[in-house]
Amino acid sequence: METSAVLRSVRLSAQKGRLVADQIRGLQVERAIRLLTFSPKKGASIILKLLESAVANAEHNEGADIDELKISQIFIGQGATLKRVSPRAKGRGNRISKPTCNIFLTVSNK
């Protein structure tokens, strides 16, 4: 039994999100929650919310036991980049790119 959760257009770069995703891939859900709770990275709190959503989906839709769940798959893809302009001297402007990412998380009891 596999249950997934998806979070799109998160204001986080995919590169920084992958640092957190690599730490929890393949872990038991309980251990991953403990690791994410105390991680200082911005992506950890975002992935923690998504993980809790996936666990709730598994419990509600499939009737799964939370203690047996583990993270079978997590991957982070690059989303659309928001482009902004920062005003500079003498009428010029610099481009600022604000990257986003899409996070796909799957939990299973296997």
From Swiss-Prot:
Q: What SUPFAM superfamilies does the entry give? A: Ribosomal protein L22
Q: Does the keyword Ribonucleoprotein apply?
A: yes
In its keyword annotation, does this UniProt entry include rRNA-binding?
A: yes
Highest taxon of the source?
Bacteria
> GO annotations under biological process?
translation
GO CC field: cytosolic large ribosomal subunit
Q: Which UniProt keywords apply?
A: Ribonucleoprotein, Ribosomal protein, RNA-binding, rRNA-binding
Q: What Gene Ontology terms describe what this protein does at the molecular function level?
A: rRNA binding; structural constituent of ribosome
Q: How does it assemble?
A: Part of the 50S ribosomal subunit.
Q: Which PANTHER family match?
A: CHLOROPLAST 50S RIBOSOMAL PROTEIN L22-RELATED, LARGE RIBOSOMAL SUBUNIT PROTEIN UL22M
Protein name per its UniProtKB record: Large ribosomal subunit protein uL22
Q: What is the lineage of its organism?
A: Bacteria, Pseudomonadati, Pseudomonadota, Betaproteobacteria, Nitrosomonadales
Gene from which the chain derives: rplV
